[in-house]
Swiss-Prot record:
Organism: Drosophila melanogaster (Fruit fly)
Bilayer-crossing regions: none
Binding residues for [4Fe-4S] cluster 2: 251, 255, 258
Top-level taxon of the source organism: Eukaryota
InterPro entries: Elp3/MiaA/NifB-like_rSAM, Methylthiotransferase, Methylthiotransferase_CS, Methylthiotransferase_N, Methylthiotransferase_N_sf, MiaB_methiolase, rSAM, rSAM_horseshoe
Entry annotated with the keyword Cell cycle: no
Pfam family, one: UPF0004
UniProt keyword list: 4Fe-4S, Iron, Iron-sulfur, Metal-binding, S-adenosyl-L-methionine
Residues noted as binding [4Fe-4S] cluster 1 in the record, renumbered to the chain: 101, 137, 175
Name of the featured protein: CDK5RAP1-like protein
Length: 583
């Protein structure tokens, strides 16, 4: 005989009341009779209620020993319809294609670490892969179009594969995956798995579900605390002398043109200790240069150290403002940079991408006082016009930016500067653009990343402004920006001729096997011939140099993008800096 819902509720209430009075009897005789005909699962459920605490137990303070528990009882929390699925890759091969910024490169190493722990292998050729993963970028429309074009090619490759013998899974990761979500599944029906930047730990499950059921799987949830601090990235190029270390994720600045806060989420920082440990591990692997990464890297604040909870409040540089309340507590970026620099004195340290508002004097002091922290700063201006900067919600004026540049160059006389600029932002007039041109001329940058504005959905600019600058005008302004930048960079680099600089050799020159290329402190490429050189401190011994060697060179020639030098000797950061102080 079946029990109605109301009868079942009455049984549950009766069982709870009986348990709260300490009774050891079961349900009423009539209910007991009904239970005999009920399924075992329902009877077990009622018995558990009887053995557990009653309603009154939640209002009375009792010793834990008086509460009835069943320590040996195990509750199965697994999902029944997934129990038969094996999340392990079992040797399936993964091929990665990375688009966009350095953060995507680091994310790829995190993803491979997660997949490797779950039985996946990496392959270099897409034709050999069981899974092809595109790590995507959504900052500009051009990047998205390249990825869409690549998907068309991969769709054809997938259709040629035998679905039974060697099926191919296509996976989209990163910012484009989060931004477009279901649209990608509808428009690009060849995609099997979509995972946002904060859901990479879920990839083994998503891949298994898609493979088992033949349906697309998606997880693009953003997190308030995921930093992947517990994942040790597996380097994709173990031979490279350089590496990336992610120290924080997300961005709170909410610039009107930028999609990053919507695809990467709110700011959250890794614990300082985990960052230092990863950098030390890289040093043991032979890495000579590490770049600390974050969408707003110098707003880093580690709030896990209790002794630092009441430390200084984060105050923007004078003349700069934020859209959020000042952040308090935690270990600031200056302390992290100092800790990393001291932990690996013979390793170069860089960081990107910062916001100008967070370049405090404490950060500048660390850069000045530690020779292994590169004297190179990225100062993204975006525009040289105050009205455009207001529409962009950058939080500073043209004048404030120029004052910061002057202050930094007084603090660090030989600093190398790089920047980002956007032309053709919503409503930009010719007069406003001329302010950008004059700013580039006035500051003079060693490196610049110049772009025509690309409207992004979900951004404040998309909701509030009109993309009203014609594409031909944008492109014409972009060419003018490039020309002005190159003129300034040429003048800056000409001043380096005759200087001795320390470069880190990264590889063979693309134009000649008889030459190597490396980068100096300002992150400018330097080309040198392959010759035998003395070793620092031993003028009698001579040897060749190669990837991963620090080489002292004298700059002989220059242009806006590349320097050419003469090798002097093999050296290291400490010896080279000591010799420069003597000179």
């Amino acid at each position: 005989m079946k029990i109605s819902y109301r009868a079942f509720v009455r049984q549950v209430r009766h069982a709870s009341t009986t348990a709260s009075k300490g009774a050891t009897t079961s349900v009423t005789s009539s209910a007991a009779g009904q239970l005999k005909s009920e399924p075992a699962a329902r009877a077990t459920f009622l018995e558990r209620i009887q053995r557990g605490p009653g309603f009154q137990d939640f209002f009375a303070v009792k010793p834990a020993s008086r509460l009835k528990t069943d320590e040996e009882e195990h509750v199965d929390t697994s999902v029944p319809y997934l129990n038969s699925i094996d999340f392990n890759g079992n040797g399936r091969k993964v091929h990665f294609e990375v688009y966009g910024c350095q953060m995507n490169t680091n994310d790829t190493e995190v993803v491979f670490s997660i997949l490797k722990e779950n039985g996946y292998l990496r392959c270099q050729e897409p034709e050999e892969a069981d899974v092809i993963m595109l790590v995507t970028c959504a900052v500009r429309d051009g990047a998205e179009q390249r990825i869409r074009n690549r998907l068309k090619h991969l769709r054809a490759m997938k259709n040629k594969r035998s679905t039974r013998r060697h099926p191919l899974q296509l996976t989209l990761l990163g910012c484009m995956a989060e931004r477009l979500k279901e649209k990608l599944l509808e428009q690009e029906q060849c995609v099997d798995v979509i995972a946002g930047p904060d859901s990479y730990k879920d990839l083994p499950r998503l891949l298994a579900i898609s493979r088992h059921y033949g349906n697309s799987a998606i997880n693009v949830l953003l997190s308030l605390d995921e930093t992947y601090a517990d994942v040790m990235p597996v380097r994709l190029n173990s031979e490279s002398p350089t590496a990336f270390v992610s120290i924080m994720r997300g961005c709170d600045n909410m610039c009107t043109y930028c999609i990053v806060p919507f695809t990467r989420g709110r700011e959250r920082s890794r614990p300082l200790a985990s960052i230092v440990a990863e950098v030390k591990a890289l040093a043991e692997q032979g890495v000579k240069e590490v770049t600390l990464l974050g969408q707003n890297v110098n707003s880093y604040r580690d709030r896990t150290a209790q002794e630092e909870q009441d430390s200084l409040k984060a105050t923007p540089v004078p003349g700069f403002s934020t859209v959020y309340k000042p952040k308090t507590g935690g270990t600031p970026f200056a302390a992290l940079l100092r800790s990393v620099a001291q932990a690996v004195p013979d390793m170069r340290i860089r960081f990107t991408s910062p916001h100008p508002k967070d370049f405090s004097d404490e950060v500048l002091e660390v850069i000045r006082d530690h020779p292994n922290v590169c004297k190179q700063l990225h100062l993204p201006a975006q525009s040289g016009n105050t009205q455009v900067l207001e529409r962009m919600r950058r939080g500073y004026s043209r004048e404030a930016y120029l004052e910061l540049v002057q202050h930094i160059r007084q603090f660090l006389p030989n600093v190398g500067l790089s920047s980002d600029f956007i032309c053709g932002f919503c409503g930009e007039t010719e007069e406003e653009f001329q302010d950008t041109v004059s700013l580039i001329q006035q500051v003079q940058y060693n490196v610049a990343y110049l772009f025509a504005y690309s409207m992004r959905e979900k951004t404040t600019a998309h909701r509030r402004y009109k993309d009203d600058v014609p594409i031909n005008v944008k492109n014409e302004r972009l060419q003018r920006m490039v020309q002005v930048f190159r003129e300034g960079a040429t003048q800056l680099h000409r001043k380096m001729e005759g200087q001795e600089q320390l470069i880190l050799i990264e590889g063979k020159s693309k134009r000649s096997d008889a030459h190597w290329f490396g980068r100096n402190d300002a992150n400018i490429k330097v080309i040198v011939p392959s010759i035998y050189v003395p070793i620092s401190g031993d003028s009698t011994a001579r040897k060749s140099f190669g990837v991963g060697d620090f080489l002292a060179v004298r700059i002989e020639e220059s242009n806006s993008q590349v320097l050419k030098g003469t090798p002097l000797e093999l050296s290291n950061i400490t010896d080279f800096h000591s010799r420069q102080l003597i000179q």
